[in-house]
Amino acid sequence: MSSVADLADIAVIGGTGFYAFLDDTEEHTVETPYGAPSAPVAVGSVAGRRVAFLPRHGAHHDFPPHLVPYRANLWALRSLGVRQVLGPCAVGGLGAAVAPGDVVVPDQLVDRTTSRPGTYVERGAVHLPFADPYCPRVSDALAGAADDVKRGGTMVVIEGPRFSTRAESQHYAAQGWDLSLIHI
């Protein structure tokens, strides 16, 4: 895929509260082979750097977690030149090591989703490495940007829109992952 523009090299996929972090924004409507993204992509400046923003659930919370157009979202961002995506999220802790308000930069994930497409690959033999799902350079930068950041840990991603049952949460917590988190 070639970029149609180089408008931003970093993007944030997050909640609508992130709009306030961008200065001098302009919206870009992008069509993709996977349909429309969650919303038009806002591109603006943060500390003099061009950053794209896309609300994960849409501008008006139109999409529940299991219906977010994930492939369209990423395709749209890449078509605008984005090379790195940050996905801040509010999560639940699965043990005493993570308290409300803690900032955690995980280094692993367990994907427990089943109904969303997990790849762009639709034909041919392609095997994608995923042993280290988070970019170490970005993780280092995030951890270095704030005090009191917990490094490492495992994010368990569940389908949504429902949260896990108590038994499911206990099961995930019993796996022995340090700094276990759960996210829809």
Question: PLM features: what roles do these ranges have?
Answer:
Residues 2-130:
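Metabolite-binding pocket within alpha/beta catalytic cores that recognizes anionic/polar moieties
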Residues 85, 150-151, 180:
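A local structural micro-motif
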Residues 133-174:
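Active-site rim beta-loop-alpha module in soluble metabolic enzymes
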Residues 176-178:
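Alpha-to-beta junction loops
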Residues 182-184:
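Conserved small/polar residues in nucleotide/adenosyl-binding loops
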